[in-house]
């Protein structure tokens, strides 16, 4: 048997022959990225050890139940809520958590640091890494090389192009 999922119902997805370990790593990556997004809302205002404790507790108490509700056949899934690559589970979930965390922790002390101006090269490198990563998340959510994966890649590319154009117009 599979000891990791003993006693749990596994959502009925078309894994297209993917080993369960691949899905575990894929889903764990979603969880890691989600907590990293939240950490930006209180960066440099709490100790690193407190951040790790928060991430561990939040992942179990908040993230895991929401994943089940949306992706695992839970109440939201039964009501017809669709979340292909994490719009609800990742973005809404961590957006709310980040807002609450920022409110609880409070403002940064502006007199401690003098922030250097933004570096355009770092901005482009960071955006490029994020862009490539989202290809993996969005296309990977199709669980195979199929039409859904191709459409996810196309939409990701179009959204990136639109965002880049909007940024150039604003700047």
Explain the meaning of each model-derived region.
Residues 1-171:
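Hydrophobic alpha-helical transmembrane bundles of multi-pass membrane proteins
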């Amino acid at each position: 048997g599979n000891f990791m999922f003993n006693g749990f119902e596994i959502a009925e997805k078309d894994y297209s022959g993917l080993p369960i370990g691949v899905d575990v790593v894929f889903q764990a990556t979603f969880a890691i990225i989600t907590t990293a997004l939240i950490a930006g809302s209180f960066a440099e205002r709490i100790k690193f050890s407190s951040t790790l404790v928060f991430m561990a507790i939040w992942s179990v108490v908040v993230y895991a139940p929401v994943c089940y509700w949306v992706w695992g056949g839970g109440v939201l899934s039964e009501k017809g809520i669709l979340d292909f690559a994490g719009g609800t589970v990742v973005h809404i979930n961590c957006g709310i958590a980040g807002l609450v965390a920022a409110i609880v922790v409070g403002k940064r002390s502006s007199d401690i640091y003098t922030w250097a101006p933004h570096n355009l090269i770092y901005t482009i490198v960071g955006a490029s890494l994020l862009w490539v990563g989202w290809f993996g998340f969005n296309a990977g959510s199709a669980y195979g090389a199929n039409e859904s994966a191709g459409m996810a890649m196309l939409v990701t590319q179009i959204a990136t192009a639109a965002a880049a154009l909007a940024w150039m117009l604003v700047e």
